[in-house]
Amino acid sequence: MEPMVERFVRYTSINTRSNEESTTIPSTQTQVDFATNVLVPDLKAIGLDEVIYNRENGFVIGTLNANTDAKAPSIGFIAHMDTADYNAENIKPRIIENYDGNDICLNEEHQIFTRRTDFPNLKNYIGKSLVVTDGLTLLGGDDKAGICEIMEALSYLVAHPEIKHGKIMCAFGPDEEIGTGADHFDVKQFPVDFAYTIDGESLGQLEYETFNAAGGTVTLKGVSVHTGTAKGIMINCAKLAMQFDALLPGAAVPEHTCGRQGFLMLMSMETQVDTGKMNYIIRDHDKELFEAKKAFFLQAGQTLNEIYGREVCEVSVKDQYYNMYDIIKDNMECVNVAKAAMEKAGITPICDPIRGGTDGSKISFMGIPTPNIFTGVENLHGRHEFACIDDMKKAVEVIVNIVNIEK
């Protein structure tokens, strides 16, 4: 088994699921253990000039010094350790060589298949080698593929000093999946001119536009009395929840939008007769439309209170991250360098806006422009997740091309 593939299988077998209910940094001890017992020793074994673990924010930082006196940018590469909110216990990665294009049986005992009819993207991988799950867990290629690709590129550069480069840094962080990891990123520990998150999906993705994002909370306040005497008195929070959601634009939801169209999405809801809570996410690429959606959301609460003539709901909105393009548009060197690196590797860059965000969204606003590059992983966050080994190798090639000053 090739070193990168062996590393990927080994890393994905380790449970590093984050926990949004936790108050610790990182949110789970498994991420701490992975960072200190696996990543730090492995980076040191590669031969980096410096490797540290920041116990305050959970980031592993590695540095490979420049090997030339020529003028060259300092470049960073970032990936996250945690996996999404899906079963990550007892992950059993399996390699499929030379995929034949048929349905993939993940688990014969439980009759779990990744079917071509459900996942037409499978046709893009005929003849390539895939890493799949046993159907009972996610894979964790998001983002351990990114980690492995960065490490493989660093290992290659250490072994090939004839490739001249400026200072290279890597950062492996926690809690990206719950949206809190980059909040604690220390840019002073990461002095680079620009960086890349290696956290995209299919071959060729180069992303430098994200959503603007906010979370909305609706606290419902009802009145509970005996149903026999409820007329004119009871206010049922379950009904309030339905009324509030009906005040929002019905077409502006994820299942009816695409491209640069934004949305409001009800993520969770819990009600009893006299109490209730609703959690929403609000997304749009355009800053003005983003602000308009937040205002509409807040107005829905006021409207519901006016209907009842009393405060039956309390609505709040909190911004989460912003569109990195607002920063990167004035710092396009990082995009142009990545495009050239992909083209040198025989890859056509695919520059579509992300219908989501990355750690790079926040890090860009901290002063380090940070676009996102593909990993070769698809069907994220579930049992049908898979990684394409061939495309992972291409990601490594792109990273090496990015830092090579002899373009």
PLM ranges: what are they?
Residues M1-G58, L64-Y86:
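N-terminal helical capping/dimerization or prosegment-like subdomains
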Residues Q29, D33, T137-C148, K231-K239, ...:
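Short, conserved micro-motifs enriched in small and acidic residues
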Residues A70-K167, F172, K394:
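Active-site metal-coordination/substrate-binding segment of hydrolases
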Residues K123-T137, K221-V225, A345, V377-H381:
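Glycine/charged-rich beta-loop-alpha catalytic/anionic-binding loops adjacent to active sites
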Residues K123-T210, A251-M267, T271, K277-H285, ...:
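Acidic/histidine-rich catalytic neighborhood of metal-dependent amide-processing enzymes
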Residues T197-V223, T227-A230, M234-L240:
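Phosphate/diphosphate-binding glycine-rich loops and adjacent basic-rich segments that engage nucleotide
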Residues A238-K407:
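Metal-dependent amide/peptide-bond hydrolase catalytic core
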